Regions:
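Structured alpha/beta or helical-core interaction and ligand-binding surfaces enriched in interleaved
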Residues: 1-142, 148-173
Length: 173
């Protein structure tokens, strides 16, 4: 069993770099400043959707999700969130083998890829039973990914395709 940090950044940021990268709340940013964050969300979304396509036999756990979570989003973010969910559902409905439970799973996958407005540390967990991996939320754009089996190359290649990075050891040192 190996646990890695799944991240959009290749290296850990020091305090000064982190302050430059996360210098404003998302709600205070203009459209141009939001672009890198939206790109990050799309990377995670593509990665999680690819995993789901590979292994539809998954178990997920959300600590909670309430309507008040939307209070932290600006109006444009709420619109972006709702439109993205609709787009995912339309895309899934176009597939021949679409189950009703897929709709909820797609929404949950999108929530997990979205900034950590909806969750808290270890608030989300997804277990893909055929691939034998567990993904646990850590912070914004950063997750633990635990390989419970020795066959992890397929997922590591998927991480690279999604332009994400796996780091090992830095969280324990």
């Amino acid at each position: 069993m190996k646990t890695y940090v799944l991240d959009v950044l290749e290296n850990v940021l020091n305090e000064e770099e982190a302050n430059q990268y996360y210098y404003k709340a998302f709600i205070e940013m203009n459209k141009k400043e939001k672009i890198p964050y939206i790109v990050n969300e799309n990377r995670y979304l593509k990665f999680l959707l690819r995993l789901y396509k590979m292994d539809k036999n998954m178990v997920y756990k959300f600590r909670f999700f309430e309507k008040w979570c939307f209070d932290f989003l600006s109006n444009s973010e709420k619109l972006h969130y709702k439109n993205s969910i609709r787009k995912l559902r339309r895309k899934a409905l176009g597939k021949k083998k679409f189950l009703n439970k897929d709709k909820d799973i797609l929404e949950m996958i999108f929530k997990m890829s979205f900034r950590d407005v909806f969750g808290f540390q270890k608030g989300y967990k997804i277990y893909f039973s055929n691939l034998k991996i567990l993904i646990t939320s850590l912070t914004d754009y950063c997750y633990f990914i635990t390989f419970l089996d020795k066959d992890e190359e397929k997922v590591k290649n998927l991480v690279k395709k999604s332009k994400l990075f796996l780091r090992w050891g830095e969280i324990w040192s």
